[in-house]
Amino acid sequence: MKFSLAFSPCPNDTFIFDALVNQKIDTQGISFEVFLEDVQTLNEWAIQGKMDFSKISYGVWNKVHHQYRLLNSGGALGKGVGPLLITKPGTINSPENYTQEAINQMTIAIPGENTTAHLLFSLAYPNATKKVFKVFHEIENAVLNGEVDAGVIIHENRFTYESRGLEKIIDLGAYWEETQQLPIPLGGIIAKKTIDPTIIQQVDALINESIKYAFANYPTVAPYVIEHAQEMSEDVMRQHINLYVNNFSLNLGSEGHAAVEKLTRI
């Protein structure tokens, strides 16, 4: 049996799916046609019902749950893993002046409209409306060249923004943790409801096995991860994996499900 499967080229996703899609584990007769795209594209495809299995932002879950089931394995949740709002030093005279009113007047780059990052930003700044939606890896440059006043960054940009002379206004993930007392639900894996539930459970278990295989061979970074890592260093790849792949990736559990449910009620 062959199914379509979509996820991002980011190290956490390629780390999770490497063993599964490259047949490093026994996939029990199941194979995949793989599509790697940025998270906003994945979210749009999910709304269209395009993929059998896909990574999505939890921010879009309310728009797709009628046609997809959420898997327990393969997701990204945790503590200290949220998006950051960053800017150039001197945009406002001093960091303590980054008030709600000041942010409301700024043009903000967001990594996609239907993303968890956008949802978390809107939770912290509900009256900020000057938004520009961009692919996540374009946001640092948009801030640096003055196209926008500030930007919400995700993924590996958490590890690079300071080296490029940018500064943090707020950690949106920390804001979520402080206000909700739950881990940050960033993204999860979904399966079409039209697929046999037994097969969905089988794939869920295979993703779990794929993650365990990856960890058994870590900290060596697999060629599949390096191939799709967009010129980042192996140290940054490991930072990325260490931050985003954890026990919640193996199994959402009750705390993970509670976090997802809370996010989708906002």
Q: Which ranges hold each PLM region?
A:
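Pocket-lining segment of extracytoplasmic ligand-binding domains
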Residues: F136-V225
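Short beta-strand-centered segments that line the small-molecule binding cleft or hinge
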Residues: L42-S54, H65-G75
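Bilobed "Venus flytrap"/periplasmic-binding protein-like clamshell domains
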Residues: K2-N22, L36-E37, P83-D149, E156, ...
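Hydrophobic/proline-rich hinge and linker segments of small-molecule sensing/allosteric domains
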Residues: L70-N97, W176-T194
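Secondary-structure end/capping motifs
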Residues: D196-R265
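Conserved beta-strand segments of alpha/beta enzyme cores
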Residues: S31-E33, R69, T129-V132, E167-K168
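Beta->alpha turn/N-cap motifs
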Residues: N12, D38-Q40, G49-N62, V135-F136, ...
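A short beta-strand-loop structural module common to alpha/beta enzyme folds
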Residues: T27-T41
